[in-house]
Amino acid sequence: MTTSIIERIDAWAEKTPDFPCYEYAGTRLSYKELKRQSDAFGSFLLKNLNTDKEKPIIVYGHMSPLMLVAFLGSIKSGRAYVPVDVSMPVERIEQIKKAADPSLFICTEELPSNLTITGCPVLTQDQLMDALEKHFGEVPDKEACVKNDDNYYIIYTSGSTGNPKGVQISQNNLVSFSNWILQDFSLSQGLRFLNQAPFSFDLSVMDLYPSLLSGGTLVPLDKTITANMKDLYREIPAQNLDVWVSTPSFADLCLLDDNFNQENNPGLIRFLFCGEVLAKKTASELLNRFPDAVIYNTYGPTEATVAVTQVKVTREVIDAYPSLPLGVIKPDMRLHIVDQETGEVLPEGEKGEIVLIGASVSKGYLNEPEKTDQVFFDYKGYQAYRTGDSGIIKDGYLFFQGRLDFQIKLHGYRIELEDIENNLKKVSYIQNCAIIPKMKDEKVDMLVAQVIPTNHDFEKEYQLSAAIKNELKEFMPAYMIPRKWIYKTEFPLTMNGKIDRKALNSEVNK
């Protein structure tokens, strides 16, 4: 059982010093090097950063080994880290920086030319490398390290106002998650873990920490590879993976390649899915292609540390239910299905809101007490979270029944539809809009924007769409930009004067 994340990771530097903790595209980082570099960086931070330890450190970059060094160095200095991926638009990065109020902004990659960080010190990649060299051999005071209920990481998710909100995950939260996943998912020493998700997406925690805590190797597939199908299909078998961690959508992409099978990936015997609905046909095809593999379906919001339920997806499970179960709750957690209006706990078989209680639940949103109080509460001395997800329990399994609000999952990313709408309304060509999810195989397939445009001079609708998307890309991530655009002169309204979203949904999902 792990009680300290850092102590257990550092222990591998003694047990297997030369074993790679990270390996990709010719770049290799051993456990000994990870400890030495994170020690050096932790020492640098303790000597040079005199601000309040409650203020986190933003770590900007993609999937380089320097990200791991910066994460662990921050923890060793007693400060939580906020991962920010290079794929984020400048405006989003600025929003996160403003909301997090960090003590330091670390760059493991070069910042975009149109982004200027003000209000806190910035450490460039060159300065980071210089700090690692100058403080090489130094070991930070263990007492300074993040511990117990201290924040360990803060991940920013989509917020309904158009501004992201930072979910605080403590050392205790992460210890609870890590112990569960290492034991219940039978993850032994020295395995090679796929890292598909960027570190700013909490699905990455499902591969990063189980890998480091079990003396395994993290094998990232960065955005240059995943953006090119041929490169992706060539790279996967070359990585000799043992453990697959991804969204179901990424697996669907890989299943388009006939060579994605057990014969070409003989070590790949565990699949862990989280972040969105796992369709039965995806699970079934994986079992066809990888007959010796074990497939786990999991569920959990960022606010409950990645995942809190799991089920082994077998042929029997696939055949027994109309949709796949999300599984059973982890041992140190409780799960209630409650009436959304009254809060009354409902019996098995009745649909209601999923409420999570226990060791995995976050303390709330950073610097957002009002938003925290809206969804987090104390339940008999335990931290609890109203997920906004609708669920039902059958045969002891949790089943997902959709969102109670306008929040959806698309390709593993949690998105507030209101967030997209608020951003669309900033565009000069848009008077009003509504975002409708197009459903396919029990999950969101794409986002459809229904738009009332302002007066414009474009002759063709595709020209208008291109102009809108060109504006949007300046302040909204690519995964949030709708794929289909429908233009209207007016929206149907409900009796109380609101946009009739049911009518719009019926048009999109005929």
From Swiss-Prot:
Summarize where ATP binds, as residue positions.
T157, S158, N297, T298, Y299, G300, P301, T302, D389, K498
Supply the NCBIfam families for this chain.
AA-adenyl-dom (TIGR01733), D-ala-DACP-lig (TIGR01734), PRK04813.1 (NF003417)
EC number(s) given by UniProt = 6.2.1.54
- Write the protein's name: D-alanine--D-alanyl carrier protein ligase
| Record-stated family | Belongs to the ATP-dependent AMP-binding enzyme family. DltA subfamily.
Q: Which GO terms describe its cellular component?
A: cytoplasm
Predominant cellular place of this UniProt entry's protein: cytoplasm
Q: Which reaction does it catalyse?
A: holo-[D-alanyl-carrier protein] + D-alanine + ATP = D-alanyl-[D-alanyl-carrier protein] + AMP + diphosphate
| Species of origin | Listeria monocytogenes serotype 4b (strain F2365)
Main function: Catalyzes the first step in the D-alanylation of lipoteichoic acid (LTA), the activation of D-alanine and its transfer onto the D-alanyl carrier protein (Dcp) DltC. In an ATP-dependent two-step reaction, forms a high energy D-alanyl-AMP intermediate, followed by transfer of the D-alanyl residue as a thiol ester to the phosphopantheinyl prosthetic group of the Dcp. D-alanylation of LTA plays an important role in modulating the properties of the cell wall in Gram-positive bacteria, influencing the net charge of the cell wall.
Name its cellular compartments.
Cytoplasm
| Entries under SUPFAM superfamilies matching the protein | Acetyl-CoA synthetase-like
Which UniProt keywords are present, listed alphabetically?
ATP-binding, Cytoplasm, Ligase, Nucleotide-binding
